[in-house]
Amino acid sequence: MTFLSKLVQAGTMFSMLALSASATSATLETSVFNPQEKSLFPVSSVLITGPTEAILVDAQFQRNDAQSVVELIRKSGKKLTTIYISHGDPDYYFGLDVITAAYPHAKVVSSAKTQEYIIASMVPKKSYWGPILKENAPQELVVPEVLKGDTLMVDGEKVKIVGLDGHDPKHTFVWIPSSKTMLGGVVVFGNMHVFLADTQTPESRHLWYKTLDVIEQLHPTTVIPGHIVGNKPLTIQAVNFTRQYIQNFETAAKASSNSSELIAKMQASYPNIGGDNILVLSAKVIMGEMKWGQ
């Protein structure tokens, strides 16, 4: 059986991978919408489909991108049963009002930690980002229900949420056991500067390393980064890239006296990756030049 993983850029779907699996493998497929650098955050929304059903992981940041996700779901021809929000940052859930308007019967769920984070921060986040997003800001905010257990189902196949009871329940990831596919969410980046403004302490970054170790121990065949720029293969290399980037950033920060020096060092180390705006923000926060809670 062939397992297809597709990346959708600016509403156009193209095949990234065609991986051969055994006859006992699942019928589940993944399709990924990522607006790339046409939007503020190149965040991945992943549609997991079986023969008749589908679940969506993450709902985009901007209304126009959420509408592209709606079109992706419609083109699949599957029944959307569930929308899972993997993290509480607004680029994962601001698009929910668009998607739930199109699919009002789909259940919206998240982990308890994610729901708690969204409830505590969604109003100030909308106040901060609304003037920036303008017409692409959410018209209303949707709060997920808490997922019972750690398993979602698609046509009888399991999709697992890994890390709910682990070392860092706020940062989990999605795992499709039958196809050994991992959806990285907030913890895996690909070919772009890693967002570090939310992990301002060595302890928080140590937990991040541990999560990357857990992913590696699963030996995934396919890794879909939560944020990615370009057409890099969807492999374990994204996990390696993320870990090495964080290590290099920490080393560069210790050797820098201000954010400008840190930015210059990281751009010299990574001259051909995306997300310069993310680097600037991360550097200012880590060097203590900017407070970050948005």
Go through the PLM ranges and name each one.
Residues 18-22:
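N-terminal signal peptide c-region/cleavage motif recognized by signal peptidases
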Residues 26-75, 173-185:
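Conserved beta-strand hairpin/beta-sheet module of binuclear metal-dependent hydrolase folds
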